[in-house]
Swiss-Prot record:
Its biological purpose: Component of the cuticle of migratory locust which contains more than 100 different structural proteins.
Pfam families: Chitin_bind_4 (PF00379)
Protein name (Swiss-Prot/TrEMBL): Cuticle protein 18.6, isoform A
Record's GO cellular component terms: extracellular matrix; extracellular space
Keywords on record: Cuticle, Repeat
Coiled-coil ranges from the UniProt annotation: none
GO MF, one example: structural constituent of cuticle
Residue ranges occupied by any Chitin-binding type R&R domain in the UniProt entry: 64-134
Length: 185
């Protein structure tokens, strides 16, 4: 028969009656306790001395600042040639710097700065002490022979076989009987 069909049972003898004891409940235990009295200590009063601000360190101020510096670079290996010197007397700064240009000339910049006229620079060029380096000849680009590339080979394989699985096993279901034998109401 069909596995999902309900089972019909017709026993010949009546089913045995079952007896159950009446439920018994214990009386609830009523336990009430008085709340616990808690004592807290008063907060501790603390006295702090007021913070003392440190006196600012005295900043040294020079009402008439003065300085002077200079440097000179002459590198025969790289051809680097530059100089600078600068001096300050109060609010007036005077200086000059020079450097070698790629064309062999020397650029000289004389500058001054003061509170009345601001920053002023005068630029002039001097003929070079060494000639400019000759331009380097650039080699023509190398033409490479074309590379032959084979066309890709297209090959197709049969599809992979898939694993086969059996159908699920039918499960028996259980439920109450449709009828019981006997005329009991």
């Amino acid at each position: 028969g069909y596995l999902g069909a309900p089972a019909v049972v017709a026993p010949g003898a009546p089913l045995a009656a079952r007896a159950y004891a009446a439920p018994a409940y214990a009386a609830p235990l009523a336990r009430y306790a008085a709340p616990v009295a808690r004592a807290y200590a008063a907060p501790v009063a603390r006295a702090y001395a007021p913070a003392v601000a440190a006196a600012p360190a005295a900043v040294e101020y020079d009402p008439h600042p003065q300085y002077s510096f200079a440097y000179n670079v002459q590198d025969a290996h790289t051809g680097d040639s530059k100089t600078q010197h600068e001096s300050r007397d109060g609010d007036v700064v005077q200086g000059s710097y020079s450097l070698a240009e790629p064309d062999g000339s020397i650029r000289v910049v004389d500058y001054t700065a003061d509170p009345v006229n601001g920053f002023n620079a005068v630029v002039h060029k001097e003929a070079g002490a060494h000639p400019a380096a000759a331009p380097v000849a650039v080699a023509a680009p190398v033409a490479h022979a074309p590379v032959a590339v084979a066309a890709p080979v297209r090959a197709y394989a049969a599809p992979l076989a898939r694993a086969a699985y059996a159908a699920p096993i039918a499960r028996a279901s259980y439920g109450p009987a449709l009828a019981y034998g006997g005329a009991y109401h």
